[in-house]
Amino acid sequence: MQAQRSERRPDRNETFSGSIEFTIPVDLAAWQNRRTTQAEAISAASVLIKYAATEALAGRDPIACPVHLTILAFFLPPGAAKFRRGDLCHTGRPDTDSVAAVIMSALDGIAWKQRGQVAELLVMKRYGPRPGVAVVIEPADDLMTMATAGEA
C-alpha cells in the first residue's frame, strides 16, 4: 500500500498568489549564430525553459488568472571595458519581442493555459557575467489591487 502525499495540490480554480521565479542558463546570442539554424537554437532554448518552469511550478496546474511576466535576459559583453562595467543595456539581437515570444510560447500549457493571460509584460536585456534568462511570473490582479489602493 502506498503512502499518501501530505501536500495538497492547488485546485484549478484557486487564485494564484505569490510569484514563480526561475532562471535558465541559455545563451540567447546563439540564436544569431550562423553555424546552427535559428530554429534549432530556439528549440533547444524552449526545452530548457519548459524544464525550468516545470521544476518551479512543482506539480501545480497552469495558472488560470491574468499574469504579469518579467523577463531579464543577460548577454556576455563584447571585449570593450565600458561593457564590462555592467552599466549598459544590450541593444543588439535578438530583440526584446523575439525573446518574449520564445519564452511565452514555451510556457504555454505549463505556467499558464494560454499566452493571452499575460496582461503585463516587462522585458529587459542587460550585459552580465554569464548568459541566461531570469523569469518572474506574478498574478496581475495583485498588481492592480496595489495600484488602485493608492488612489483611495
Per-region residue spans from a language model:
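Acidic, proline/glycine-enriched N-terminal capping motif
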Residues: 1-152
